[in-house]
């Protein structure tokens, strides 16, 4: 009896499901080769997650029930982890503007199993967080700030990892509760050269992200200042232990004003969103998926 081509069967069914759903993309995690399958739907490949349930298998000496549990629990964790990996990749591509909303189809393979999953992009925690901030900051400004944050998290600047923060909205209050550490590089420039909605201005933001301090950005996306120091009382701010002063002060300014803060950690490139002094979302850096040509 011949060997069943499980990956090939899964791949063909994933394509069929995606076409029936009019999916904006198929996102693949694992050793699937879809090069020979014709479809007009964009196919993205995300890097494989490192941990596999085979690393969690135990010796035969344990009781069967415990042994089964020790296999099933890691399998459930891995399935959840791989699904979240695909969902996060889809959300980031949507934020960056490479992926429209809709139901994406994910194709997952590990050394032990394979699966097809579907995910509605608009229901992503990241997208819902942006919607939660809509009353305070224009959603497009929020999207652009996150796109720049992901870019900084991924590539840094001139080979160096960068940590910075964007304080969005309630500009007048934020400026009153902060001061310049250096000469404001945006002072005196026309709005058109400070507008984040114009992609031509993103490079200057990434350049000035090397400066100490934070960016202050209006709810309409106009950069008011860079290299700004926040004068806040960090007392009673409850954030993850081990985070530095930039994260503490960014969280504190959102407690004291109606601003939203987006932070990028220098170590690891983790992107966080704060509102009302609390962390709304934490996204660990993941390598962006590659588009199949």
Which residues does each PLM region occupy?
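Divalent-cation
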Residues: 2-252, 261-293
């Amino acid at each position: 009896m011949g060997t069943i081509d499980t990956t090939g069967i899964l791949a063909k069914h994933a394509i069929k499901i995606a076409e029936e759903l009019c999916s904006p993309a198929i996102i693949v995690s694992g050793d699937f080769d879809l090069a020979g399958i014709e479809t007009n739907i964009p196919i993205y490949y995300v890097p494989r997650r490192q941990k596999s349930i085979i690393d969690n298998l135990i010796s035969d000496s344990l009781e069967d029930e415990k042994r089964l549990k020790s296999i099933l629990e890691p399998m459930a964790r891995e399935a959840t982890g791989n699904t979240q990996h695909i969902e996060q990749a889809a959300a980031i591509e949507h934020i960056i503007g490479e992926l429209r909303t809709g139901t994406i189809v994910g194709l997952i393979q590990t050394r032990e199993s394979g699966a097809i999953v579907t995910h509605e992009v608009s229901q992503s925690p990241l997208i819902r967080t942006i919607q939660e901030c809509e009353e305070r900051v224009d959603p497009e400004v929020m999207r652009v700030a996150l796109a720049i944050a992901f870019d900084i998290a991924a590539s840094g600047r001139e080979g160096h990892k960068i940590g910075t923060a964007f304080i969005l909205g309630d500009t007048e209050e934020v400026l009153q509760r902060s001061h310049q550490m250096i000469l404001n590089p945006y002072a005196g420039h026309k709005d058109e050269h400070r507008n984040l909605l114009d992609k031509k201005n993103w490079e200057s933001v990434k350049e000035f992200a090397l400066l100490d301090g934070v960016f202050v950005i209006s709810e309409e996306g106009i950069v008011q200042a860079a290299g700004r120091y926040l004068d806040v009382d960090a007392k009673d701010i409850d954030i993850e232990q081990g985070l530095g002063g930039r994260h503490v002060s960014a969280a504190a300014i959102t407690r004291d004003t109606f601003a939203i803060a987006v932070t990028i950690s220098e170590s690891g490139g983790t992107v966080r969103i704060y509102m009302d002094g609390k962390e709304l979302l934490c996204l660990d850096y993941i390598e962006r998926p590659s588009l199949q040509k």
